[in-house]
């Protein structure tokens, strides 16, 4: 059912498996503390977390190589048949402050298996131990390296949550620079406004089992550093219309029980207004980055649509 020319509601009610996953998640220790004070205390006392290791079976299932860009680790996975026609540069989420989660690896595998793509995963250094500039340098260097051996128009930028922010920010930097451009942009529940300024987000917060507005604002300030979190540089939702008009075809997937749904709708509308081929797919009662739970009906539909987008 189409609600607007650019927004498509993909489910009217959640699958039983997704409801079960949400119930389990709601009873676990949250990924991020739920109050600003708890988050600040956690960040001040934490031991720097490490990236979840890639499952050992991946080495048998895919052709895997590890390399460095901007002094940081990068992993590339090809199907056993060899490098694919399309190469996905995928940035994992984690609020810029958390490394690769174990749940991200099955999503990487599912994208390779369903879409037949090669995938490169930058394992970027996190803030505040590192900085936004270090993360941006890695993104820039990784794309430049891939573009040396692969047609840039056959590179798709992808990311979830803060990783969606990184993919989009990279696309905007490349557009402004005017050099080689990626062919497509796929965003899973992207974080678009670090300040979480829209009051409508407050109505979604009671339904979001992962994210809280105050904690996200703290993460955003930490990532922005000396910059203004509300600037177009830090919050792509506020990028200029001129810059947005330069973006490649874009698809966005966000659950309706995700704080980011409000800004996803606004951003898709902005892209449409400036002439970008953009679509937003929404899922009833789906939580933040629901597609990482790959056995669910909703995740399978996301991957189906991603495959169709790549094939267009």
Task: Enumerate the predicted regions with their spans.
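Alpha/beta-hydrolase superfamily serine-hydrolase fold, recognizing
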Residues: 65, 69-75, 79-312
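A glycine/proline-hinged amphipathic helix-loop "lid/cap" segment
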Residues: 1-80
């Amino acid at each position: 059912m189409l609600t607007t020319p650019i927004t498509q509601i993909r489910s009217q009610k959640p699958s039983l498996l997704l409801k079960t996953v949400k119930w389990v998640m709601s009873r676990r220790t949250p990924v991020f503390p739920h109050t600003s004070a708890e988050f600040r205390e956690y960040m001040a006392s934490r031991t720097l977390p490490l990236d979840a290791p890639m499952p050992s079976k991946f080495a048998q299932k895919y052709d895997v190589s590890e390399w460095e860009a901007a002094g940081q680790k990068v992993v590339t996975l090809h199907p056993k048949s060899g490098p694919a026609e399309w190469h996905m540069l995928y940035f994992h989420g984690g609020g810029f402050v958390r490394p690769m989660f174990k749940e991200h690896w099955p999503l990487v595998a599912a994208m390779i298996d369903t879409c037949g793509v090669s995938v490169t995963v930058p394992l970027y250094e996190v803030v505040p131990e590192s900085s936004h500039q270090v993360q941006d340098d890695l993104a820039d260097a990784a794309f430049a390296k891939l573009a040396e051996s692969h047609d840039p128009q056959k590179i798709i930028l992808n990311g979830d949550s803060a990783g969606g922010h990184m993919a989009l920010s990279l696309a905007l930097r490349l557009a402004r620079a005017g050099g080689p451009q990626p062919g497509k942009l796929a965003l899973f529940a992207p974080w678009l406004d670090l300040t979480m300024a829209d009051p409508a987000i407050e109505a979604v917060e009671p339904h979001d089992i992962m994210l809280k507005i105050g904690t996200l604002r703290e993460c955003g300030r930490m990532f922005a550093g000396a910059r203004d979190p509300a600037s177009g540089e830090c919050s792509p939702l506020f990028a200029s219309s001129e810059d947005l008009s330069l973006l490649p075809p874009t698809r966005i997937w966000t659950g309706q029980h995700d704080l980011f749904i409000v800004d996803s709708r606004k951003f898709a509308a902005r892209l449409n207004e400036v002439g970008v081929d953009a679509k937003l797919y929404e899922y009833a009662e789906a939580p933040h980055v629901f597609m990482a739970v790959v056995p669910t009906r909703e995740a399978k539909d996301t991957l189906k649509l991603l495959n169709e987008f790549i094939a267009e």
